[in-house]
Amino acid sequence: LKNVNVSRQSIYNFIKRNCMEKVGPGIYISKDVLEDEAYVLSQRCPKGVISHDDALYYYGLVDREPFVHCITIYSGYNPSALTNSGYKVYTVKKELLDLGKTTITNQFGHEIPMYDLERTICDLVRSRRNFEIQDFNMAIKTYLQRSDKDLNRLMVYAKSFRIEKIIRQYMEVLL
């Protein structure tokens, strides 16, 4: 707002006058509006991609809304501000960060970066020790029943993450 000559004091007065609440650095919402935590997270970390539990829930692979919102960022990024705020942060090599990245419109009407279905399955398998076995199995089975699944894309992603063998084993057992 400095570019259009709006002073800090004017901004603070506007926030106070409109009873807004700070939800992140430079991010304010009206107190009578339900907070879109995934959107706030994507604004706090614009280079990150909403992932794991959030993506599983968005795609209907699990039926429980996540308790903790998840984001994936490149290795070397300092996630302490995000983890201190209660977010779960996953890291990948920089060259893998955009693999499977897409933009979705969530239930609040906000566009947020999120991984596609196949990348979400790869993340699930890579982080399988962090998931309850029932949720893990339900997500894999639900994915395999979907008409919009792309097993070829899944295997391309699996190769990039070096988890082809593991993915094949799950597919053989569950198909």
Residue ranges and their predicted role:
Residues N3-K16:
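Short amphipathic alpha-helical interaction segments
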Residues I15, V23, I27-L175:
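Nucleic-acid-binding surface
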